[in-house]
């Protein structure tokens, strides 16, 4: 994993842990959504596993993308178009940047 991808993976993990904290209700009671908190924490741990080389970055980012898209589908289906939508937009932006780095490494 390149230094840039490693740094981005760390930032992405922090985004997922931040979202998990928000959905745990610790910061804002209105954000309480336990299933989302658990899923986001697990996805953050998958990214940490990639950082410490327990899993390949490609596999980790594939898992995290699938989980994020699943979460986004729930957000849209429930009409939660405020903070929850923006959290997923930020997550997807981070994932897009990571995939760009992963594919750039592969073709270079």
Where are the model-predicted features located?
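Membrane-water interface at the C-terminal end of transmembrane alpha helices
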Residues: 2-11, 51-59, 94-108
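Membrane-helix boundary connector in multi-pass membrane proteins
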Residues: 55-90
